[in-house]
């Protein structure tokens, strides 16, 4: 049996502007990103000027969460980016507030956020503090009441994601 795997297509022209690559996968964690065998190879093909990491909430939801392991994994991910693209700017977006089973605040959310802030300082990365922008622990409930978060108290609605994008764009610009 013959197989074919398409890992991506890059189409472009000579016009200046922004080229956007998204490598998001629902449920991804630092551990799953480190398990990607071609991450460095793929990053070397696109040579980004800016890499935005917005991962952490899935790590925080892990019942076997370890702050030390999370920090080691995230540190290794940043290291992979720096190895392949030492001149790329790196922006860390902190985790959002969320709940487990719609009832229990994710107790590791603050530890994940603190780890990101430490790593940003260590590696000279920018930080956009989504957790703080949302309002901290419990804020996802307010976002849900305003139609910005889904009933699972983890994910956002289209309006919520749009607002997050607008707020992040405003902060960067």
Predicted regions and their residues:
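Catalytic His-Asp segment of secreted/periplasmic serine-dependent ester chemistry enzymes
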Residues: 96-173
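Conserved SGNH/GDSL esterase-like catalytic core that processes O-acyl groups on lipids
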Residues: 1-76
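Extracytoplasmic/secreted envelope proteins and their assembly/folding machinery
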Residues: 36, 40, 71-78, 113, ...
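Generic preference for flexible, low-structure residues
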Residues: 25, 34-41, 64-67, 90, ...
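Residue-level recognition of the N-termini of beta-strands and the immediately preceding loop/turn
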Residues: 18, 88-90
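Short, functional N-terminal and low-complexity linear motifs
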Residues: 5-8, 40-48, 83-87, 129-137
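Conserved N-terminal glycine/acidic-rich loop preference
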Residues: 47-60, 68-84, 91-130
């Amino acid at each position: 049996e013959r197989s074919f795997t398409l890992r991506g297509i890059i189409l472009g022209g000579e016009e200046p502007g922004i080229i956007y690559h998204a490598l998001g996968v629902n449920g991804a964690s630092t551990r799953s990103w480190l398990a990607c065998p071609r991450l460095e190879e793929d990053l070397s093909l696109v040579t980004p000027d800016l890499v935005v990491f917005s991962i952490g909430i899935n790590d925080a939801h892990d019942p076997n969460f370890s702050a030390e392991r999370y920090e080691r994994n995230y540190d290794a991910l940043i290291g992979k980016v720096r190895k392949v693209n030492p001149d790329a700017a790196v922006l860390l977006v902190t985790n959002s507030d969320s709940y487990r089973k719609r009832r229990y605040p994710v107790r590791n959310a603050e530890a994940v956020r603190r780890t990101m802030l430490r790593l940003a300082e260590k590696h000279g990365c920018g930080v956009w503090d989504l957790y703080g922008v949302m309002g901290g622990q419990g804020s996802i409930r307010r976002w849900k009441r305003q139609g910005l978060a889904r009933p699972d108290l983890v994910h956002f609605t289209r309006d919520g994601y749009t607002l997050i994008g607008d707020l992040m764009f405003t902060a960067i610009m």
